[in-house]
Amino acid sequence: MITIDGSYGEGGGQILRTSVALSTITGEPVRIVNIRANRPNPGLRPQHLHAILALKHLANAEVKGAHVGSRELVFIPKKLEAKEISIDIGTAGSITLVLQALLPAMVFAREKVKFRITGGTDVSWSPPVDYLSNVTLFALEKIGIHGEIRVIRRGHYPKGGGIVEGYVEPWNEKRELVAKEYSRIIKIEGISHATNLPSHVAERQARAAKDELLQLKVPIEIRTEISRSIGPGSGIVVWAETDCLRLGGDALGKKGKPAEIVGKEAAQELLDQLKPGHCVDKFLGDQLIPFLAFSGGVIWVSEITNHLKTNIWVVESFLGRIFDVDGNVGEPGKIRVIRRV
C-alpha cells in the first residue's frame, strides 16, 4: 500500500483527488494521511467525499475514513468498471474539482462512462465549468480522449444547485502531446453568463473583456448566456485558440463588483497566460499531468505552479520517475515526459 502525505507542498484537495484517481487506474491501494492539513478547515470537504465515493463506485473499492472532516483515508480498489455516475454534492462544492478526480479514472474504463453532478458550476478556487468544456477537453482530444461536458443549470455560491452532465469514451488510442510554443492566435472566444440577474450584467462583462482583448487584433466572439437557477451569480470565461492548444482566463462576479471589472479581470488573466508564448496555460498545466504520464510528450507552460509540482509528486509516488521539469515556481517552464507508463 502506498502512503501519501496530504500535507505535502500546497497540501490541498488535489493530492487527494489525484491519489485516489491513480489508485483506481493502477489498482494500487493507497493510504492518505494529513488530508488538507494546510487548510483553514482541514480534512475532507463534501466535494472531496463525493469524488471519493464516485471512484469507490467505479473501482468497486473498499474505503475507510470516507466522511466529512476525516484527516485519513484508505482506498483499496478492486476492478474498474464502466458505470453511470450520479453525484449530488449537496452544497456549492465545485463540480469541476470532482471531475478533476473522475476524468483520469473514467477514461480507463472499458466502455463509455456517463455522469451527472449537482453542485457549483462557477465557484471560487476552482476552474469554471466552461473552462473545462472548452479548454481542458480541447487539449484531451489531442491525446485521444473524447468526451462532453454540458451545463444543464448554473450553480453559484452559496446555494449551488448547478447540474452538469456528460460522458467520456474509453481511452483506446493514446497520442503523445507536443505543445511547446504557439506561433499565432487564430481567434478569441468566450461565454459570459448571468443567472437570476439582469441580462445587461452578462453583456457588460462581455463588452469589457472584448475591449481589453482588441489589442490582439484577432476575431473575438464572446457569447452571452442568461439563465435561471436557485441563486444569483455571474461569470465569464475567455479563451484564445492558437495553432497549438487553447489558453484561458476567467473571473467571477460578486455583489458590489461592477460587471466591467469582472470582464476586464478575465481578459487580463488571458493576456497574462498568452504573454510567455507557451502553448499551455497555468491552469491546464496541472490538469494534464496525470494524463501525460500515460500519453507521453512535452508541454511548455505559461507558469509553473505549486499545484503542478504537487501533482507531479503524487503521480511519481505511484508510477516512479516520469517527468523532467525545467523552470521555477512562478515562472514559465517546460515539462517533459522522460518515461511514459
Curated annotation (Swiss-Prot):
Record field: catalytic activity: a 3'-end 3'-phospho-ribonucleotide-RNA + ATP = a 3'-end 2',3'-cyclophospho-ribonucleotide-RNA + AMP + diphosphate
GO cellular component: cytoplasm
Signal sequence annotation: none
MF GO annotations: ATP binding; RNA-3'-phosphate cyclase activity
Pfam family, one: RTC_insert
Binding site for ATP: Q100, F283, L284, G285, D286, Q287
PROSITE patterns linked to this entry: RTC (PS01287)
Record keywords, A-Z: ATP-binding, Cytoplasm, Ligase, Nucleotide-binding
Catalytic machinery residues: H307 (tele-amp-histidine intermediate)
Family that this chain belongs to: Belongs to the RNA 3'-terminal cyclase family. Type 1 subfamily.
Function: Catalyzes the conversion of 3'-phosphate to a 2',3'-cyclic phosphodiester at the end of RNA. The mechanism of action of the enzyme occurs in 3 steps: (A) adenylation of the enzyme by ATP; (B) transfer of adenylate to an RNA-N3'P to produce RNA-N3'PP5'A; (C) and attack of the adjacent 2'-hydroxyl on the 3'-phosphorus in the diester linkage to produce the cyclic end product. The biological role of this enzyme is unknown but it is likely to function in some aspects of cellular RNA processing.
Protein's recorded name: RNA 3'-terminal phosphate cyclase
Native species: Pyrococcus horikoshii (strain ATCC 700860 / DSM 12428 / JCM 9974 / NBRC 100139 / OT-3)
Gene: rtcA
